[in-house]
Design a protein with these regions (language model features):
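Small cysteine-rich, disulfide-bonded extracellular modules of the LU/uPAR three-finger superfamily
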Residues: 1-75, 80-114
């Protein structure tokens, strides 16, 4: 059984309220509120996106720029605050992001309820 589009959109809209802060990790962040393997940002902390609701069961976030050290980043984390044990969700990055020197990682979050 599938959800009608209006119901999918309502669920996506609720989800965006859980957290707007995003970060990156060098491995799986795990299933606790403290993201494991999170980057030690070179300037600042996790960065907030600005969510926009669509009409097809999705929400789209504005791009966030994270100042990160050299490393291989395999996962993104969604949190409810810029710091602390506030992780609510995570996802594998595709493709993996490799920084050979300190630089910026750009994430553009999206969520779809299917």
């Amino acid at each position: 059984m599938g959800l009608i589009t209006a119901r999918r959109q309502a669920l996506a809209d609720v989800w965006k309220g859980y957290g707007a802060f995003f970060g990156v990790c060098t491995g799986s962040p795990g299933d606790t509120t403290t993201p494991a393997n999170e980057a030690s940002y070179t300037s600042g902390n996790r960065v907030a996106t600005t969510w926009a609701s669509n009409s097809d069961g999705t929400v789209s976030g504005s791009a966030v720029l994270l100042n990160a050290p050299a490393g291989t980043y395999t996962h993104g984390t969604q949190c409810s605050a810029a710091t602390g044990a506030t992780q609510i969700a995570w996802a594998a990055l595709s493709p993996t992001i490799i920084l050979n020197a300190a630089g910026q990682v750009v994430l553009t979050p999206q969520l779809a309820v299917v």
